[in-house]
């Protein structure tokens, strides 16, 4: 668990992350701003253009590989604890973006972490995993240009974790992750193995590798980069890079969507009418009355409905700018905006659910499960 001098800044990949000012992360945690690199990125993603990806760690080697059409990898995954939600959607889209830019894509089913962090039995996580991979394929992941695997069944990852354990003291693990049971420290070492496996000779490594993460997962990257430096002589590792994205607010206005509050989030498998109800009841940056909003405008910066557009469901950058300016000017009322958002989200979810049905068998085949 990483904390800064400001008690309101906490990055905890296994717990609660608290961020009041993203700009402070540049100084306090050494995350580098992404914006200065934006004009150099061939075909930047929606998240890059909109500053949703606000930071990075050592992205330049990946950027150079993209510009020079050289080999590089993208690595991410999912903890199989349930259905695809907006956080996993964001990361999956980032993986698919880099895959389309030429990366070899590695996607991990983090079943060891699911067991250690969430007490999900391996048999149960296997069932979740098949559904998660069907979602990934429906979103556009190309399995011919990727490698999908389960942590518990990938011996190379486990071997790396054992080797990395020689360089990880209990004091280091406590400093990075806080006081945890040993199993979570093991899961962190395995995740380091996930991140660095694409650089093994079995996969034509070493090579630049980018890991798209939410800011709450940044401690994993710092830990893994330290291990990569320590084992560079043995494996010739290139220090792994990352892109760092912001965390979406809960629909209820909370700092983060949480399964503890069903009204704060939705999955890609919920009924459209349920999703519509949740958006209709969402917190907004609007004023108490129509008159006040017309006169002084809304506050899109704190509005989860605006974030649905900004992060996920409005592809047109010009429309995003218009929604923002109309809200600030009092031209767009919250009720009208919610109806637009409901239409965009429900249309996307309906189409996704239909596409996903076509990939269930393929997902089971890739994972070798029934």
Locate each region found by the language model:
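Short helix-capping/linker segments at secondary-structure and domain boundaries
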Residues: 103, 197-208, 313-322
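Non-catalytic terminal extensions that flank enzyme cores
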Residues: 1-78, 225-280, 285-292, 296, ...
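N-terminal Rossmann-like or analogous alpha/beta NTP/dinucleotide-binding catalytic cores
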Residues: 2-73, 80-200, 354
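A short, terminal or domain-edge coil/loop segment
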Residues: 126-134, 158-172, 196-212, 262, ...
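Structured ligand/cofactor/substrate-binding pocket environments in proteins
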Residues: 84-89, 96, 111, 120-125, ...
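Short, solvent-exposed polar/charged micro-motifs at secondary-structure junctions
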Residues: 156-162, 223, 252-255
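Short, flexible loop/turn elements at secondary-structure junctions
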Residues: 78-80, 152-154, 215-217, 252, ...
């Amino acid at each position: 668990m990483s904390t800064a001098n400001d008690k309101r800044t906490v990055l905890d990949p296994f717990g609660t992350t608290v961020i009041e000012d993203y700009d402070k992360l540049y100084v306090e945690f050494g995350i580098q701003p992404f914006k200065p690199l934006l004009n150099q990125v061939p075909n930047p993603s929606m998240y890059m253009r909109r500053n949703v990806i606000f930071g990075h760690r050592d992205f330049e080697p990946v950027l150079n590989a993209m510009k020079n059409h050289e080999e590089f990898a993208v690595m991410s995954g999912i903890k199989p604890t349930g259905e695809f939600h907006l956080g996993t959607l964001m990361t999956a889209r980032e993986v698919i973006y880099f895959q389309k830019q030429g990366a070899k894509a590695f996607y991990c089913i983090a079943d060891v972490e699911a067991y250690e962090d969430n007490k999900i039995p391996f048999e149960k996580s296997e069932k979740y995993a098949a559904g998660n991979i069907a979602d990934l394929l429906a979103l556009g992941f190309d399995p011919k240009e990727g490698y999908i695997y389960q942590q518990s069944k990938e011996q190379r990852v486990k071997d790396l974790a054992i080797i990395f354990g020689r360089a990880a003291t209990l004091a280091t693990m406590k400093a990075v992750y806080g006081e945890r049971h040993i199993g979570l420290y093991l899961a962190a070492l395995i995740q380091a193995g996930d991140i660095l496996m694409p650089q093994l000779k079995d996969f034509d490594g070493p090579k630049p590798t980018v890991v798209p993460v939410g800011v709450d997962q940044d401690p994993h990257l710092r830990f893994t980069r330290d291990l990569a430096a320590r084992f560079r002589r043995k494996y010739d590792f290139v220090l792994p890079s990352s892109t760092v994205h912001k965390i979406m607010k809960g629909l209820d206005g909370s700092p983060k969507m949480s399964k503890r509050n069903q009204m704060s989030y939705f999955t890609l498998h919920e009924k459209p009418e349920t999703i519509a109800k949740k958006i209709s009841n969402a917190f907004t940056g609007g004023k108490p009355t129509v008159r006040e909003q017309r006169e002084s405008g809304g506050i899109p910066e704190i509005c989860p409905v605006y974030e649905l557009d900004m992060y996920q469901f409005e592809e047109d950058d010009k429309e995003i700018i218009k929604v923002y300016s109309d809200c600030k000017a009092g031209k767009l009322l919250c009720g009208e905006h919610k109806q637009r958002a409901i239409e965009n989200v429900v249309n996307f979810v309906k189409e996704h659910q239909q596409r996903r049905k076509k990939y269930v068998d393929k997902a089971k085949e890739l994972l070798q499960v029934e």
